[in-house]
Every structure is written in structure tokens, then in C-alpha cells.
């Protein structure tokens, strides 16, 4: 997967490209990341990339010229059909389905990281194909949001995770949250690991995990259950969980 990043702070991305699942994907060649700094596409001695907004107001606005030149260079290197994405609190809310769509669209992506009060609206109209948000809150810039998107995409690419099946237990896979997990010791301050997880019966363990994944979803994100059609087994397991939960 080819991925371009337009950012004023390229070194920030060392935090993910050198470590964890993203670093593994980069080292294996599944994810190829290139970065362009808009300051490298300025022609004045101060490398100016921002200016005051017309009409007044607080903050500064990223200028269109350096950003557009950086995007043009990215398209020249990655391909003119690369999809340009602006990470913005005004964008569509990112979810797991869209992560899969972006990761498997066989198209290079260019992530534009805004700073200051935002970017010139004309750049959005001229160059941005999609706007995406990671939540209803504001960050100091688009770099952290881009890292979230990159990490989410990297873990669904082939060869990134050591165990491909681990994706299937992730929260939001098939619109369900994940089940609880436990590790040693078996007992900690009187709290015991559920006996079924110690039984060695994988059929019972899988059934328990499905039951508690559904239960977790019902308690924490009931809105997700409205998006899926439960099987008869899932309905029975969820009913069983509800009865146990409500009875204390």
C-alpha cells in the first residue's frame, strides 16, 4: 500500500513507522510511506506556510500555495490517481468499515495534516477528495489523526499481524465489541479467571467469548447491535447474558 503524508512535522511519524504493527508493515514492504513538508515548497526566505484569515478572527490559516505544490509532488511520485484525504473535525466519522475500504481500494492515499486554525478552503475544493474525522473533538493538528488512520489500516493489511485471525476478535469486527481477556495469575485479590477459560474446551471457550462480546456490546455500545442481524445462537447467548447480568 502506497501512502503519502503532507505535514509540517515529518519527525512525528517516527513514533509509528519505527515501532509496533505499523513498523512491521513498513519493514515488510506492505506499507510504503513517503512524507512531504509544505515548507519545502515555499519560495520566500522564511518558508512561510500560514497567514492571517481574511475577514479577521483568531488564529492563522495554512496557505494554499505550499500545500498545493506538496500535493502535486506527492501525486507525481505516487500516481496522479492517488486519493487525497484531509484529516479534519468536519469530516465523516471514521469507523472500521471505512478503514477496510481505504486499505483495500488498491489506490494510493495522500493524507493532508492541517495545522493552526485550518487550511484555505480553496484547497479543499480543488484538491481534497474526502474529509475524515476520528471523533468529535479538536486536536492541535492532523498528524495524530493521521497516525490513528495509518495504524488502523496497517493492522488489516496482509502480513502485518502475526496471527491473521486476531483481527476477527477485534472490537468493531462485524459491529461487535471484543470479549474480556485474562492472563496469569488465576486469582488476583480474590478475583478469579472464569473457569471456562481454564477448561481447555475450545468449543465452550469460543461460545463464552461470543456471549461476552455480545454482552459487552449490549452494555457499552447498544447502537452497534442495531446494525447487525443476530443469528439464532447469538440471540440465545445475548439473552442468557442479559438474564445473568440483570440478576446480578
Curated annotation (Swiss-Prot):
One of its GO terms (molecular function) is tRNA (guanine(37)-N1)-methyltransferase activity. It catalyses: guanosine(37) in tRNA + S-adenosyl-L-methionine = N(1)-methylguanosine(37) in tRNA + S-adenosyl-L-homocysteine + H(+). Keywords: Cytoplasm, Methyltransferase, S-adenosyl-L-methionine, Transferase, tRNA processing. Gene3D superfamilies: 3.40.1280.10, tRNA(m1g37)methyltransferase, domain 2 (1.10.1270.20). One of its GO terms (biological process) is tRNA N1-guanine methylation. One of its GO terms (cellular component) is cytosol. Coiled coil: none annotated. Its EC number is 2.1.1.228. It is found in: Cytoplasm. S-adenosyl-L-methionine binds at residues 114, 134-139. The keyword Transferase applies. Homodimer. Specifically methylates guanosine-37 in various tRNAs. Belongs to the RNA methyltransferase TrmD family. This is tRNA (guanine-N(1)-)-methyltransferase. The gene is trmD.
